[in-house]
């Protein structure tokens, strides 16, 4: 029983063989905190959270780092436009990011390093690259010389000339070659900056992740994840500067990248007006529903995110929680998933659609059986769901939960109406009792009367 992952570097699925089986090292690029994160930013967080959970079932220790980029030209621009300090802006959006990712049921990473706390190792890495002949100073900048690395482009599988077409490559007269990228840039007096051998300045975009990985995880890590849009130039340049700084030592053993998120069949963009922040979505949908939607496609595929998908995800979770609600009391502590089709699908490059299919199969077993067979299936259902970050609420709480921006009736209001309905029935005022049931139904509340009383759920 072993994990297989698709390696962007080799462009094929490979058995996962860690550098050190006693301690797995994984890094995922986090947000640049100048605004609220959108649903596309959330996909890699959810995907690699699932991988984090799976790895923890296989290895004694998994160290997962996901950074916060808190120094960047976009941050400086946003702070200036908002009339607030950079530290205030980044603190505000870092907090919002942490809250939003927690609302999507993501585990916190082992480490959440911030770029500004790693300026010294960044400067040290630049100095090493200059000393080894892989970087040069020009016009107050320090640039990486891409032609000094003979296999530059091995991650994105591009020739040097091809990389300049349509990529985020800054054109500047001071570069020896157009593809050279900035490691360190000068800062004006009114811009944030740090003292360095090349003058007061700040780090380039790519340098930050390399320095944080070196500091917390070492020169070689097992897995580096992120969105497909980061393959070039960001991850290509990360790889180049890290391997050249460390004498050619392998930087990352497995590169993993998730596909894009489209909105209603179109690329998500502010210009199209289909830009959806996680915070906006949480006003309308439970975080677990959004998470389920993000896992409905295999992570390397493009995901068409839509209201229809969210509604299907809500219905799917209703079905699964409904099975758990009616299941015999059980514990997931001693559940063995080693031969379960869903767990094996997770080990096969995180095939989450197959896992979801297995969850529904287990739910059917729970619904059609009683006693021990139903209890075993329910325990497997909850344990397997847990590896996806799903089905960890009490079923009763799921059916009664409201969204953060909801104008729905509160649980207290509903309970009060149920008491009023009960009193009306006792007083033989059946018209009022029926009126209350109708009122609740119209507001999406289903009542279920039984010998033990009246229960309710949102529909």
From Swiss-Prot:
This is Cysteine--tRNA ligase. It comes from Saccharophagus degradans (strain 2-40 / ATCC 43961 / DSM 17024). It is an enzyme of class 6 (ligase). SUPFAM superfamilies: Anticodon-binding domain of a subclass of class I aminoacyl-tRNA synthetases (SSF47323), Nucleotidylyl transferase (SSF52374). ATP binds at residue 270. Keywords: Aminoacyl-tRNA synthetase, ATP-binding, Cytoplasm, Ligase, Metal-binding, Nucleotide-binding, Protein biosynthesis, Zinc. Its main location: cytoplasm. One of its GO terms (cellular component) is cytosol.
């Amino acid at each position: 029983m072993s994990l297989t992952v698709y390696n962007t570097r080799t462009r094929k699925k490979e058995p996962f063989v860690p550098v050190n089986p006693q301690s797995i090292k994984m890094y995922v690029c986090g947000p640049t905190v100048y605004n609220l994160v959108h649903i596309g930013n959330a996909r890699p967080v959810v995907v690699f959270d699932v991988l984090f959970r799976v790895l923890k079932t296989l290895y004694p220790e998994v160290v997962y780092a996901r950074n916060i980029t808190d120094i960047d030209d976009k941050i400086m621009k946003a702070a200036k436009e908002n009339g607030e300090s950079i530290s205030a802006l980044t603190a505000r959006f870092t907090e919002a990011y942490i809250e939003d990712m927690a609302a999507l049921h993501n585990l916190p990473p082992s480490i959440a390093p911030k770029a500004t706390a790693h300026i010294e190792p960044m400067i040290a890495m630049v100095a090493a690259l200059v000393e080894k002949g892989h970087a040069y100073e020009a016009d107050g900048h320090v640039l990486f010389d891409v032609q000094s690395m003979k296999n530059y482009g091995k991650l994105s599988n591009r020739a040097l000339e091809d990389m300049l077409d349509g990529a985020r490559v800054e054109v500047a007269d001071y570069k020896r070659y157009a593809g050279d990228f900035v490691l360190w840039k000068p800062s004006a007096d009114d811009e944030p900056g740090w003292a360095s051998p090349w003058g007061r300045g700040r780090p380039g975009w790519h340098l930050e992740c390399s320095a944080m990985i070196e500091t917390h995880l070492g020169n070689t890590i097992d897995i580096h994840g992120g969105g497909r849009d980061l393959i070039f130039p960001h991850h290509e340049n990360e790889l180049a500067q890290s391997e050249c700084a460390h004498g050619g030592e392998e930087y990352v053993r497995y590169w993993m990248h998730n596909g894009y998120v489209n909105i209603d069949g179109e690329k998500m963009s502010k210009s199209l007006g289909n830009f959806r922040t996680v915070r906006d979505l949480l006003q309308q949908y439970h975080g677990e529903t959004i998470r389920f939607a993000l896992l409905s496609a295999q992570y390397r595929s493009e995901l068409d995110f839509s209201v229809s998908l969210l509604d299907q995800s809500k219905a799917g979770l209703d079905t699964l929680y409904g099975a758990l609600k009616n299941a015999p009391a059980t514990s997931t502590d001693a559940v063995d998933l080693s031969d379960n089709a869903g767990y094996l699908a997770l080990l096969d490059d995180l095939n989450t659609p197959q896992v979801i299919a297995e969850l529904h199969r287990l739910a059917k077993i729970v619904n059609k059986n009683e006693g021990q067979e139903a209890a075993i299936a329910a325990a497997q259902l909850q344990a397997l769901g847990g590896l996806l970050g799903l089905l960890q609420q009490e079923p009763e709480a799921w059916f009664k939960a409201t969204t953060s921006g909801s104008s729905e009736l509160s649980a207290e209001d509903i309970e009060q109406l149920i008491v009023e309905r009960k009193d009306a029935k006792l007083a033989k005022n059946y018209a009022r009792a029926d009126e209350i049931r109708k009122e609740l139904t119209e507001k999406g509340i289903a009542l279920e009367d039984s010998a033990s009383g009246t229960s309710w759920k949102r529909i």
